[in-house]
Amino acid sequence: MSSDCWTPFHARLHQLLQRRSLLPTRSRLLLAVSGGQDSLALVQLLRGLQPHWHWSLAIAHCDHGWRSDSTANAEHLRQLADQWQLPFYCQRSPEPPRSEAAARTWRYQVLEAIAADIDAALLVTGHTASDRAETLLYNLTRGSHLQGLASLRWQRSLSDRLTLVRPFLGFTRAETSKMVQQFQLPVWEDSTNRDRRFARNRLRLEVLPQLRQINPQCDRHLANTAELLADEADWLAELTEQVYQQSLSERGLCRSQLAQQPIALQRRVLHAFLQDQLQRSPSTVQVEELRQLITAPQGSCSSSLPQRRVAVVAGDWLRLQSVDD
């Protein structure tokens, strides 16, 4: 089907982009494309909307080298880009990343470099409401604070010059499947997406289908929950920063001020304090240990923290010091 054929899917995305101001007119967009159904559906809709928004579109593909068919996958996308008359950029990892986290880090480094080379201010991915639901469930199973449950935002800054945008969070994976059929898109199936050794794949292939039997709209409802949590997380982050700055001095954190705050806010302020002091995200156990020190007697201290440091009570102040002091 031609990209200039206007469908209800195009209309929905057009209205969503207007409402959320995600992809401004005449922007240069770098589209991260794997070849799967979500990213190809994204390209198809954006190509259809391009005459209305006057974007400059380019495709980027990151080849992790994990699969025997990864080179063929990249060539398939190169041919599609030629067919669509879009610039195509591809980079293969020097060696296969050892974990999903390492792959993600490498992938975003590559995409940021490509975006800088072509002067693109927006990196666009095909993450859907189903991905958001999956991420919410995944973080719940691991135990997560509010910020983790509110992950996969509509947009987030990657650097001073590049913003990641996810315009497909308004669609489910079932809907992108319908797009693939309607537009007859040549999807390249990634066999690793069906490998049940990965926790996310088990959620996608086993858990979410069971939840859909309880409520067929669970993907969208879970994604909406993540959206609500994101708004609350933003508000709490502002409040936390305000209380943190009010409680902080050269002597440490003021215990009497913290004692007046709700427990949830105490935890968030202490988390921010430890992260600033240690330059790493503290564990829940470490935060709780410090919270007990808010009302502890003079001279009390925590167990050892990273960098051979401990938290100690000094009058009305809670501060970190070296275990050697």
From Swiss-Prot:
It is found in: Cytoplasm. One of its GO terms (cellular component) is cytoplasm. GO terms for biological process: tRNA modification. It catalyses: cytidine(34) in tRNA(Ile2) + L-lysine + ATP = lysidine(34) in tRNA(Ile2) + AMP + diphosphate + H(+). InterPro entries: Rossmann-like_a/b/a_fold, TilS/TtcA_N, tRNA_Ile_lys_synt, tRNA_Ile_lys_synt_N, tRNA_Ile_lys_synt_subst-bd. It is an enzyme of class 6 (ligase). Its main location: cytoplasm. It comes from the Bacteria. ATP binds at residues 34-39. One of its GO terms (molecular function) is ATP binding. Pfam families: ATP_bind_3, TilS. Keywords: ATP-binding, Cytoplasm, Ligase, Nucleotide-binding, tRNA processing. Its EC number is 6.3.4.19. HAMAP family: tRNA_Ile_lys_synt (MF_01161). Belongs to the tRNA(Ile)-lysidine synthase family. Ligates lysine onto the cytidine present at position 34 of the AUA codon-specific tRNA(Ile) that contains the anticodon CAU, in an ATP-dependent manner. Cytidine is converted to lysidine, thus changing the amino acid specificity of the tRNA from methionine to isoleucine. PANTHER family: TRNA(ILE)-LYSIDINE SYNTHASE-RELATED. The N-terminal region contains the highly conserved SGGXDS motif, predicted to be a P-loop motif involved in ATP binding. This is tRNA(Ile)-lysidine synthase. It comes from Synechococcus sp. (strain ATCC 27144 / PCC 6301 / SAUG 1402/1).
